[in-house]
């Protein structure tokens, strides 16, 4: 389905990392139940947004192929040294036609199907710049999930300046802006694969 002429929210799949704990493979292309992790995420994220972007610094052709049914655009970081998720965020914020960008890592195949709606509701209610997911477990322990967030694209210039200054920490940059935390009780929905063992655990979920 073509993207709306005036989209309100762009979905950004963050697939540009090094995956150093997985021998440098492209995590988004690793298989879970015979399907690339990135495709699992796209199937959940794309229905929640108006346009879809994929931040990928490698294998752009492969990402274009698997995301073709979603009419996604493939983008790359402006710097070549894998500077981390903030660089992917910046690329997405600058490429988006929408005023808001909802981001998700490429290795979280069970992300909530109401993620964007809940982040948007909190962003609007608090008139915030950023809405970030926070999981809460059975013991009431809160765990921020900074790469699951909704951000205003008007923050792009400030982010570019911080990256140019050498800042790479996502939460440190969020702290510069009005950020609202949105609680999610199903922490399993945010499980990801940072190692081969965690990928195997996802398959057993």
Swiss-Prot record:
Its cofactor is Mg(2+). Disulfide bonds: none annotated. One of its GO terms (biological process) is bis(molybdopterin guanine dinucleotide)molybdenum biosynthetic process. The keyword ATP-binding does not apply. It comes from the Bacteria. Mg(2+) binds at residue 107. InterPro entries: MobA-like_NTP_Trfase, Molybde_CF_guanTrfase, Nucleotide-diphossugar_trans. Transfers a GMP moiety from GTP to Mo-molybdopterin (Mo-MPT) cofactor (Moco or molybdenum cofactor) to form Mo-molybdopterin guanine dinucleotide (Mo-MGD) cofactor. It is found in: Cytoplasm. The N-terminal domain determines nucleotide recognition and specific binding, while the C-terminal domain determines the specific binding to the target protein. Belongs to the MobA family. Keywords: Cytoplasm, GTP-binding, Magnesium, Metal-binding, Molybdenum cofactor biosynthesis, Nucleotide-binding, Transferase. The gene is mobA. GTP binds at residues 14-16, 27, 77, 107. One of its GO terms (molecular function) is molybdenum cofactor guanylyltransferase activity. SUPFAM superfamilies: Nucleotide-diphospho-sugar transferases. This is Molybdenum cofactor guanylyltransferase. It comes from Burkholderia cenocepacia (strain HI2424). GO terms for cellular component: cytoplasm. It is an enzyme of class 2 (transferase). Its EC number is 2.7.7.77. It catalyses: Mo-molybdopterin + GTP + H(+) = Mo-molybdopterin guanine dinucleotide + diphosphate. Monomer.
């Amino acid at each position: 389905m073509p993207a709306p002429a005036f989209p309100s929210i762009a979905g950004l799949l963050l697939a540009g990392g090094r995956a150093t704990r997985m021998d440098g493979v492209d995590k988004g292309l690793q298989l879970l139940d015979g399907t690339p992790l990135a495709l699992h995420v796209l199937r959940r994220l794309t229905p929640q947004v108006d346009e879809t972007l994929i931040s990928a610094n490698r294998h752009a052709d492969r990402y274009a192929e698997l995301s073709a049914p979603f009419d996604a655009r493939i983008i790359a970081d402006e710097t070549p040294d894998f500077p981390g998720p903030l660089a992917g965020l910046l690329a997405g914020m600058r490429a988006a036609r929408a005023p808001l960008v909802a981001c998700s890592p490429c290795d979280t195949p069970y992300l909530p199907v109401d993620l964007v709606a809940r982040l948007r509701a909190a962003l609007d209610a608090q008139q915030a710049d950023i809405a970030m997911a926070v999981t809460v477990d059975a013991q009431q322990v809160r765990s921020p999930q900074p790469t699951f967030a909704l951000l205003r694209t008007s923050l792009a210039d400030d982010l570019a300046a911080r990256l140019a200054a050498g800042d790479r920490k996502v939460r440190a940059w969020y702290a510069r802006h009005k950020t609202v935390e949105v609680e999610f009780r199903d922490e399993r929905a945010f499980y990801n694969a940072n190692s081969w063992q965690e990928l195997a655990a996802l398959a057993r979920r």
